[in-house]
Amino acid sequence: MPMLMATRIDIIQKLNVYPRFQNHDKKKLITLSNLDRQCPLLMYSVFFYKNTTTRDFDSVFSNLKLGLEETMSVWYPAAGRLGLDGGGCKLNIRCNDGGAVMVEAVATGVKLSELGDLTQYNEFYENLVYKPSLDGDFSVMPLVVAQVTRFACGGYSIGIGTSHSLFDGISAYEFIHAWASNSHIHNKSNSKITNKKEDVVIKPVHDRRNLLVNRDAVRETNAAAICHLYQLIKQAMMTYQEQNRNLELPDSGFVIKTFELNGDAIESMKKKSLEGFMCSSFEFLAAHLWKARTRALGLRRDAMVCLQFAVDIRKRTETPLPEGFSGNAYVLASVASTARELLEELTLESIVNKIREAKKSIDQGYINSYMEALGGSNDGNLPPLKELTLISDWTKMPFHNVGFGNGGEPADYMAPLCPPVPQVAYFMKNPKDAKGVLVRIGLDPRDVNGFSNHFLDC
């Protein structure tokens, strides 16, 4: 949309936001786990809310500010900053009350209706979030930022960024729900945070000590699955270098596409493909997407291909993580085969069984080995790994229900922005259908038509 791309976003004000109350239980330093340290960048999402009055909009920003002040009083690491440990190589969170940043803005002359289908990624969305300049120094980066942008129609958007070192998807969801609730409820104790999802009081637990690597345990339990994972990645890197000896990377541009599947369509696809075999929507869609993407890529039949998907480990550690754990608590499970085996020999039922086996393998030994591997040296960014299909399941985190709207109304839509790894496939709740799923994936422009045809033809 050229008109929208050229539209100026006018910044009305930018201010720092600090915790409203002093938390006497606050730690000055939170030692991060290796899971937390993998991606300190801000992860952005934009929440869209339709028509409101000017007076209502004027109160939106102030209510959000008050709600954030109150929320950070309990979720106090959100007001901190990242910093290196004494050795100068590992990130931790300094709880120094450095504060979050909020911006009020106006999209001059733009109506929400002009954005078209909100489920489809639009480069204009990048203007609806505040992106602090870092110059490579993460110690000055706020861990939470927000931008409230008013549109000409009276609607508005709330663009939120949170550091992935601070939260994973589940804890980000809980934090944002608490923030939305605190923006509208004023007669509550300053030590309690309401989670709108279940209408219960939750207390976040920020201590990561249960996920710090126990090297003795790692030596005792050498997880073959995680070793296999890294062998696949290494093999893919070697193959790429052999084919591109000058290491000239191809165009890294991706097209972000969203495929909307309602519950009836998913059930119809399952019945047609599985012939009575019972499985979850995630299992079916993961297996089907892996085959569709691999087929669209046109890989050599002897090429090794790999499916990896995030698994929540909160209840999988020997001592389950406490309710309200606010850090990163996921590892990747892995399934591998050759392209020939995947496309010509394996049925969807057999792929689903492999997915189940991979998920079942996530125990304390796997977790220990995975985290130990993440703490190893990193010689640089990986080259493109076309053979690797990545999936993140957000269907248990209905972000569109976040009540930042008038009187706590849910969002009309929540759009995640382009992530650091754009080819990751996200499975998200379909706000129009409780059993539906939105599948969002980054694709090479040359593969869009092929993937679309294979994925939708089932």
UniProtKB/Swiss-Prot annotation:
The active site is at H164. It is an enzyme of class 2 (transferase). Induction: Induced by 24-epi-brassinolide (24-epiBL, eBL) and inhibited by abscisic acid (ABA). Stimulated by auxin. One of its GO terms (molecular function) is acyltransferase activity, transferring groups other than amino-acyl groups. The keyword Transferase applies. Signal peptide: none annotated. GO terms for cellular component: endoplasmic reticulum; nucleus. Its EC number is 2.3.1.-. Disruption phenotype: No obvious growth phenotype under standard growth conditions. The bat1-1 mutant exhibits longer stems before flowering, but reaches normal height after flowering, with larger inflorescence stems containing an increased number of vascular bundles. Highly expressed in young tissues and vascular bundles. Mostly expressed in young leaves, primary roots, flowers (including petals and sepals), and siliques. The keyword Coiled coil does not apply. Pathway: Plant hormone biosynthesis; brassinosteroid biosynthesis. It comes from the Eukaryota. Keywords: Acyltransferase, Brassinosteroid biosynthesis, Endoplasmic reticulum, Lipid biosynthesis, Lipid metabolism, Nucleus, Steroid biosynthesis, Transferase. GO terms for biological process: brassinosteroid biosynthetic process; phloem or xylem histogenesis; regulation of cell growth; response to abscisic acid; response to auxin; response to brassinosteroid. It is found in: Endoplasmic reticulum; Nucleus. Brassinosteroids (BR) acyltransferase with acyl-CoA ligase activity toward brassinolide (BL), castasterone (CS), typhasterol (TY), 6-deoxotyphasterol (6-deoxoTY), and 6-deoxocastasterone (6-deoxoCS) and thus converts them to corresponding lauroyl esters. Regulates BR homeostasis and promotes BR-mediated cell growth regulation. Involved in vascular bundle development. Belongs to the plant acyltransferase family. This is Brassinosteroid-related acyltransferase 1. It comes from Arabidopsis thaliana.
